[in-house]
Amino acid sequence: MLKVLHVLYTLMLALCLFPMVVHAAMDEPIRHHRIIITGNCPFGVILANPLAYRQVVGVGPWAFLHADMNVLKDMKPDIGRITTHFINDDYSVNLETLLTLHPDLIFYYGQSQNDHLERAGVPVINLDTGGSAKYDPEATQNYWETTFEDALGLPRTDKFHRAWETTRKAIQPYADRIRQQHVRALYLEQSDGKTLRVSGPHTFGDTYLNMAGMENVAGHLQVSGDAGRYITVSMEQIMAWNPDVIFVVFGSARALLNNRNPGQMWQGTRAWKNKRIYSTPVGLHNWGGLSAETPLLPLFMVSKLEPDFVSDAEMRGLTRAYYKTMFDYAIPDRLLNEVLSQR
């Protein structure tokens, strides 16, 4: 059986050339831009490239709302220089405030985030990959990475492709064994006590479950349009599905396990009875969305379902190595505990 310790070294070796690439690039003059990113998930990709990160002056507030700011501030002590104030409370763009940032490049993710950004009079770049690739986390992060680097005149680093490739190779023997068990999983996007939303087919959540060898209980639903892929369901529907395991993204696994959400009856599910309800980690962003740490998520899911395959200690070691190789960040124990703790 492939050990995660070996995977850890593979990941480190796969990424070890990146610092040399960066230093070589710094020998050549690089034009400094003032860039704005209206979305949240693409910002994580820029955090892995110091030459790109230093050029960011504004980012959508979701980038910080769904992050563990203790981790983000420790890794990037200057993060406070990046403003979110150009986004109004209704999530529309405040053009007057945006222009005070004097941007020369604006990146947005999908047409819903455009908000007539051409009014700013500077180039705008859509980070939506389009087609079926937009639901593939690896293809999406690869696209973001190369688009940022090309637009900013930076050398290609290929970090996220290598990170995902490492995960795919590492997880294969585990996923094959889990697949034989026909584990039925629910990817619970939202569970705030008011709305229950799940990942249907052709979503990032569906992809993560499949990578980990699990079957998405909502994967057979008929959906249409991007918004429809994240499906509002009833508690009765979830009880009928009776999932073996539940991964909670924007919500609290503890709230479900302790029945703290009014009107929800999780004790009727197999996952609740076996205490197999888990929150996705939160670091630079929530891993369960599409964060800079998400290449680790399928292995995290395996570690919760089958700790004999991937132990907590191995998951901690892999996470620590990932932060160091991707961000040159030595995460302290107390913050590593925060990232991997159950909410």
Tell where the protein language model's regions lie, with residue ranges:
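Positively charged n-region of N-terminal signal peptides that target proteins for export
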Residues: 1-6
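Bacterial N-terminal signal peptides
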Residues: 7-20
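Extracytoplasmic substrate-binding proteins
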Residues: 24-25, 29-30, 34, 113-197, ...
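Short, well-structured alpha-helical segments in soluble
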Residues: 25-27, 91-102, 232-240
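Structural recognition of the beta-strand scaffold that forms the well-ordered cores
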Residues: 36-38, 57-60, 105-109, 124-128, ...
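A short, structured surface patch at a secondary-structure boundary
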Residues: 38-101, 105, 110, 214-217
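Alpha-helical, coiled-coil/dimerization segments enriched in small aliphatic residues
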Residues: 200-228
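Active-site/pore-lining binding-face segments in mid-to-C-terminal subdomains
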Residues: 244-305
